[in-house]
Amino acid sequence: MGKLDGKVAVITGGTSGLALAGAKLFVDEGAHVFISGRRKEMLDDAIELIGRNVTGVQGDAANLDDLDRLFETVKQEKGAIDVLWTSAGTGEQGKLGEITEEHFDSTFGLNARGTLFTVQKALPLFNDGGSIFMTGSNASLKGYPEWSVYAASKAVQQAYARVWLSELKDRRIRVNVLTPGQVATPKQEELFDEATKRQFESLIPRGTMGHPEEIATVALFLASDDSSYVNGMELVVDGGTAAV
């Protein structure tokens, strides 16, 4: 018996990295999973990798029309949601004196605004007793130089969780934040050279980056009844980086 048997999960940004690993694990544990992403090729590849009990919807989590289409698809195919993982996000470096309006708006547009409206538009379909969690970042805890916009856009999510759990308590919907540190994903490979990756690893007490599957197991915990008494919390999964 799987931990998510009969459940319906929606994962934004579910076409790569830790969210894709989570989507695959959720299906293995009995869920039907809806994943969304902007790039059709990546969406098709993710569906093929997961292999079963998955529906892909192309769209941008910062675009409200795309969000409407995502949840209309969920409504037509399954009628309700038990788990929502908002993992669509973006970020780039920028020194304080060089941050542009476009940089700020695009980062907050997806990480903060997109997250809020994803949750808002999911709520009419949500079963009471469900689980919502958002992907944070330990950048909001560590103060890495040149990451102020990204860090601030992720810190928003802890505030969301604290407020929303109060608003949703009568429906027994839990709201948490899953906060990874450095994880070896295709995005990391794209953003950072080997020297930068080695520098990041030097900050991690265990000496190596995390793997998507290590984050996925924590996501499964938050999605399942194993975390039934966990609400309004930020679970930091970064190999101890934020603690030292």
Language model feature labels by segment:
Residues 8, 15-16:
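Conserved glycine-rich cofactor-binding loop
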Residues 85, 169, 174, 230-232:
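Short, small/polar-rich loop/turn modules that mediate ligand/substrate recognition or access, typified
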Residues 95-96, 100-108, 188, 200:
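Substrate-binding pocket helix/loop in short-chain dehydrogenase/reductase
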Residues 119, 153, 161:
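Active-site helix of classical SDR
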Residues 124, 165-170, 228:
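Alpha-helical segment proximal to the catalytic Tyr-Lys
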Residues 125, 209-237, 242-243:
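C-terminal substrate-recognition "lid" of short-chain dehydrogenase/reductases
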Residues 137:
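Residue(s) in the substrate-gating loop at a strand-loop-helix junction
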